[in-house]
Amino acid sequence: MPFLSINLVFERLNMEKYDIVMVFPAMGKTVVSEEDSRFVDCDTFKYHYRIPNKLSHLPIDKLKGADSLIPINHWEDTFIESLEHCSGVPLVNTNILIYNKLVELGKRVLVVLPLKKDFDLVMQRIRDRGGIDYDDSWVSWFENLYSEFGRANVIEYIGANELSERLKGWKDYGYL
């Protein structure tokens, strides 16, 4: 049965070969990259911020949202350049600026967003791991991100817990 559903997804999307997969936050890209070496979790965090020495001992999930991080100007170009040297299929968090630059460069980007019914579940995961407080401004930022990507060229809406299975299937069938 999973074989049939994967083929239907390919047919519906008229899938071609994609260079990069952009995934909505908290859908499991880190887990997938840890399970399967064909995928690389390309986190923008280390390109986007300079970490002060006093925080350098903390793991990345504890650093996100820290007040003393130092933003890096024009980090996007360095990040995009780093994708060229990836040893697998790059999995990137959704970012409309990065998406537009990649498309401009001729990269084929598949955008993966949660189904509307799973949006609240994904938001709860982000809150649970300390990524955001339950604050209207953060929630609306993610809702805006969701709607911005609703206009992407190739988009796939999947359940919040389906990323691993879908990515592996797409890779096995030659679409990534």
Regions found by a protein language model. Name each.
Residues 88-94:
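Structural recognition of the conserved hydrophobic beta-strand(s) that form the central parallel beta-sheet
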Residues 2-14:
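Short, Lys/Arg-enriched N-terminal segments with co-localized hydrophobic residues
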Residues 34-83:
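Conserved substrate/cofactor phosphate-moiety recognition/catalytic segment
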Residues 128-176:
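Small-molecule kinase domains that catalyze NTP-dependent phosphoryl transfer to phosphate-bearing small molecules
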Residues 18-36:
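Glycine-rich phosphate-binding P-loop
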Residues 93, 105-125:
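Conserved phosphate-donor/acceptor-positioning beta-strand/loop module used by diverse small-molecule
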